[in-house]
UniProtKB/Swiss-Prot annotation:
Residues 1-21 form the signal peptide. It comes from Pyrococcus abyssi (strain GE5 / Orsay). It holds the Pfam family Bmp. A lipid is attached at residue 22 (S-archaeol cysteine). Keywords: Acetylation, Cell membrane, Lipoprotein, Membrane, Signal. GO terms for cellular component: plasma membrane. Its main location: membrane. It is a lipid-anchor. Belongs to the BMP lipoprotein family. The modification N-acetylcysteine is found at residue 22. InterPro entries: BMP_lipoprotein (IPR050957), Peripla_BP_I (IPR028082), PnrA-like (IPR003760). This is Uncharacterized lipoprotein PYRAB04520.
């Protein structure tokens, strides 16, 4: 779920932004050790998306600073350029690791990886479905973040005088099934802990790229009584943000929104007090660290709360993305510090201490492994879990553990 920006190109294929930092001032020494060299291959659109690509940049910059690696950033001109670019880089044998950001790299990687067994690849937020020694796929346990967001949304709904929460979701695909299960689980967990009933209105839009559809869907959910809407549709849910803003400013009622993946509070901090986090930056850093440490092992890795791979954004994260928005010319009426102050005030107003207590309790159960969420393998299994959760059967969503 991400918003695509303008793609830039050099040599007809890519934009290469070489981050120096690998050469200090002064004369080179003869004994200088060879640095690990990494290429970060952004999704189409590159930097400035205020989402996946910018988070990948954060993770790579952290690796450069903490691990001393050399980083190059590259953006394909289009989807058609992805495979040629990937093949070109693998052929060059210049890079210890190629990090591929986003699901659009899945098919190109499947076509290229077997040809270059000595080239290491890391695919972020997708999987080729094949286990290779030279490939690591890093996925996220979305249920864990969504469960916390379900608790938070439920608490905010009651502060707004209602008992209904909603979600504007993208396409009916497995990652969204996990979000749905987690979000509903969190709402029912809140219900069980407080005795306050919570109703969830979940709506698939069928798109990740249509703001008008997001706006219209959000308005329908607000008209049905939703007090808090969770955006799970990429660019589409930016329209949801606009709808919530209009709903409040037109005097039609009080409502709040929650973002997802990157910190999105900067977009309308008065109405978006919190965002769920999918830490692409952590995934990128971890992949690079495996190469540096010599702990590389091909296969699929999942990141959740325990690994700091998912969760919700703290105020430092809010400020970081507000600064990105400012750099991109999208934060025009306030400073990043003002965004943080507004968000802090809104969180204090709408997310009460008892709600944070429930969030932290659930968070600890997940981190410790006391409870583990199921990952549905079929749509039928997904639907069955949702039906059971709606009845209040929280254990239907769990692979391990139970909620009494």
């Amino acid at each position: 779920m991400r918003k695509l920006g303008l793609a830039l190109s050099i040599m007809g294929l890519l934009l290469v932004s070489i981050v120096a930092g690998c050469i200090g001032g002064g004369t080179e020494t003869k004994t200088e050790a060879k640095k690990v060299k990494v290429a970060i291959l952004f999704d189409v659109g590159g930097r400035g998306d205020l989402s996946f690509n910018d988070m990948a940049y954060l993770g790579a910059e952290r690796a450069k600073k903490e691990l001393g690696v050399e980083i190059e950033y590259m953006t394909p001109k289009s989807k058609e350029d992805m495979k040629p670019l990937l093949e070109q880089l693998a052929q060059s044998k210049e890079y210890d690791l190629l990090v591929l950001v986003g699901f659009l790299w899945t098919s190109p990687l499947n076509e290229v990886a077997d040809k270059y067994p000595d080239q290491k690849f890391a695919l972020i937020d997708s999987t080729t479905g094949k286990v290779r020694e030279n490939e690591v796929d890093i996925l996220f346990r979305e249920q864990e973040a969504a469960a916390l967001m379900g608790v938070i949304a439920s608490g905010m709904a009651y502060e707004l005088g209602g008992d209904t929460i909603g979600a504007v979701a993208g396409m009916d695909i497995p990652p969204l099934w996990k979000f749905h299960i987690g979000y509903l689980f969190g709402a029912k967990y809140f219900e069980k802990k407080t005795g306050k009933p919570v109703k969830l209105l979940w709506q698939y839009t069928g798109t990740f790229g249509d703001t008008q559809v997001g706006y219209n869907t959000a308005m329908q959910l607000l008209q049905q009584g939703a007090k808090v809407l969770y955006g799970l549709a990429g660019l589409t849910h930016v329209g949801m943000f606009d709808a919530v803003k209009d709903w409040n400013e037109q005097g039609r009622g009080k409502a709040l929104a929650m973002g997802q993946d990157a910190s999105q509070e900067w977009y309308a901090p008065k109405y978006i007090p919190i965002s769920g986090a999918k830490r692409v930056d952590v995934a990128v850093y971890d992949a690079i660290k495996m190469v540096v440490d010599g702990t590389w092992k091909g296969g699929i890795i999942t990141l959740g709360l325990k690994e700091n791979g998912v969760g919700y954004w703290d105020l430092d994260g809010v400020k970081q993305f507000a600064e990105f928005a400012k750099e991109a010319g999208k934060l025009k009426d306030m400073t990043p510090d003002e965004v943080v102050q507004i968000v802090k005030e809104q969180r204090e107003k709408y997310i009460k201490p008892y709600v944070w207590d429930i969030v932290h309790e659930l968070e600890e159960k997940i981190k410790s492994g006391e409870i583990v969420f199921k990952t549905p393998k079929t749509h039928e299994e997904y639907e069955q879990i949702i039906r059971e959760l709606e009845k209040g059967n929280l254990n239907a969503a769990l692979e391990k553990g139970s909620v009494e």
